[in-house]
Amino acid sequence: MAQDRMTQLRDFATRYTAAWCGQDAGNVSKFFAPSGSLTINGGTPSVGRSAITQAAQGFMTAFPDLKVSMDDLVEKQGKILYHWTLEGTHGETGRRVRISGFESWRIGEDGLIAESFGNFDAADLERQIKGADS
């Protein structure tokens, strides 16, 4: 049964990845419970689909050709760890970026993300946007 759960979660994560690549922030938010939350790098949580749509749109606006790939998906201590890589061109500077990070999901009874805590190296992203080599 655990294998079936991971198969279902991997399918869910694959569709979530495609939603990010589809440049439709509202579609990304549909993977969250109506009162779900997304917290990025310990910041203020985006709570509810409208707020999550706005958060996703921020990335999509900053990187109009954004592509996300799923690097790994594991279950650990009751959480689902979704590891990803984002590649894209920063809209204002024209600089290409590539960052990796992860989200720690708590999946609700409805099969949607109830809570997501995301993390990536924001300083590295800023260096790439500014064009610094180190």
PLM regions: where:
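Short, low-complexity N-terminal intrinsically disordered segments enriched in polar/charged residues
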Residues: 1-34, 132-134
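A beta-strand edge to alpha-helix "cap/lid" segment located at domain peripheries
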Residues: 2-8, 39, 53-134
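Short, flexible active-site loop motifs that bind/organize anionic cofactors or intermediates
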Residues: 15-18, 42, 115
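Short secondary-structure boundary/capping elements
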Residues: 20-23, 51, 97
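A short gly/proline-enriched turn/hairpin at secondary-structure junctions
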Residues: 31, 35-47, 58-62
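Secondary-structure boundary/capping motif
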Residues: 47-48, 93
